[in-house]
């Protein structure tokens, strides 16, 4: 993998999140992929289980946006950073998260291992 390939994968990840199309989601991951929503929970195992997990708890279209970019690419592994924003019904930012992904890819460019760390940014009313 190189930086461009990882950036394209991340763009596909954001598109799949927006569409919730099972084929788009599945195309991102290897058959035996592991997907950890956070580093401390048991990961979801297998492409079909990952797709089902995504489809279980959908965000409403237009209520969020995301942007991610590679920070480091070394062989079949990558680290990416970005943000996810969620909006109120009036369009203002309700919540914002910084995200860090640790990724490993197979020879076909599909993600074989996904582990995410996320941290909510403090809001204007939150103590810094």
PLM regions: where:
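Short beta-strand segments in beta-sandwich/barrel cores
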Residues: 33-35, 85-86
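A beta-strand edge to alpha-helix "cap/lid" segment located at domain peripheries
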Residues: 2-5, 51-128
């Amino acid at each position: 993998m190189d930086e461009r390939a990882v950036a394209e994968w991340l763009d596909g990840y954001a598109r799949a999140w927006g569409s919730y199309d099972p084929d788009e989601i599945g195309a991102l991951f290897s058959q035996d992929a592991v997907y950890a929503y956070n580093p401390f929970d048991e990961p979801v195992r297998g492409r079909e289980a990952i797709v089902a997990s995504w489809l279980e708890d959908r965000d409403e279209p237009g209520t969020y946006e995301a942007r991610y970019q590679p920070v480091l690419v070394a062989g079949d592994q990558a680290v990416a950073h970005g943000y996810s924003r969620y909006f109120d019904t009036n369009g203002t930012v309700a919540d914002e998260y910084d995200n860090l992904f640790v990724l490993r890819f197979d020879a076909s460019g599909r993600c074989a291992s996904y582990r995410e760390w996320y941290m909510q940014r403090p809001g204007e009313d939150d103590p810094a």
